[in-house]
């Protein structure tokens, strides 16, 4: 069976990591974008110090695109024919994220899918514990009243069949489904 002494998950590891990444940002606003796109990619190389420590590389990439629209006119700024798009902040956003781990993957460094920064509507790490993943999201944001805004979203994600590639197969042991989707909405309040 799987135990910490079988080499796949030693009771103690000492690792150092070297991180490299890049961003190509064409967003009109980094905090609350309504148009433009951003491409992010990164690589984190883990190197062992001592015995029984794994060597592996975590690769991640994401692409987000925001398109300004005017579909619903709840606020005064959105009802005006002369207001600019930034007075009537509405946007449709799309995001694609992916990642994989190359090398000797320790289970505690696996990708967890599900949660508020992953596939919303699922609990944190509720969908999968995997070596690779892909997620896609679409969201519509609209101002409702003064500082209150609303959003509708659709998220989906998959472990790309890689839960079995994690030593000890924690995703399978915990009955993680490996892929899923969600539809939902939310209310936000902008604060100064």
Predicted regions and their residues:
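Transmembrane beta-barrel wall of Gram-negative outer-membrane proteins
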Residues: 1-10
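Exposed, low-structure sequence patches enriched in small/polar residues
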Residues: 4, 27, 32-34
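C-terminal transmembrane beta-barrel domains of outer membrane proteins
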Residues: 15-18, 35-192
């Amino acid at each position: 069976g799987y135990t910490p002494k079988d080499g796949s998950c030693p009771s103690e590891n000492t690792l150092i990591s070297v991180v490299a990444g890049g961003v190509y940002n064409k967003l009109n606003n980094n905090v609350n974008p309504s148009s433009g796109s951003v491409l992010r990619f990164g690589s984190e190389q883990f190197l062992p110090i001592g015995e029984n420590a794994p060597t592996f590389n975590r690769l991640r990439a994401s692409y987000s695109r925001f398109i300004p629209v005017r579909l619903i006119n709840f606020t005064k700024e959105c009802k005006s024919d002369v207001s600019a798009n930034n007075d009537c902040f509405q946007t449709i956003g799309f995001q694609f994220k992916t990642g994989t781990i190359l090398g000797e993957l320790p289970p505690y460094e696996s990708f967890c899918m599900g949660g508020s920064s992953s596939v919303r509507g699922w609990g944190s790490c509720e969908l999968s514990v995997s070596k690779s993943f892909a997620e896609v999201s679409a969201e519509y944001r609209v101002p409702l009243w003064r500082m209150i805004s609303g959003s509708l979203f659709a998220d989906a994600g998959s472990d790309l069949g890689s839960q079995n590639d994690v030593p000890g197969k924690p995703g399978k042991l915990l009955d993680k489904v490996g892929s899923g989707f969600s539809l939902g909405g939310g209310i936000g309040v902008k604060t100064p």
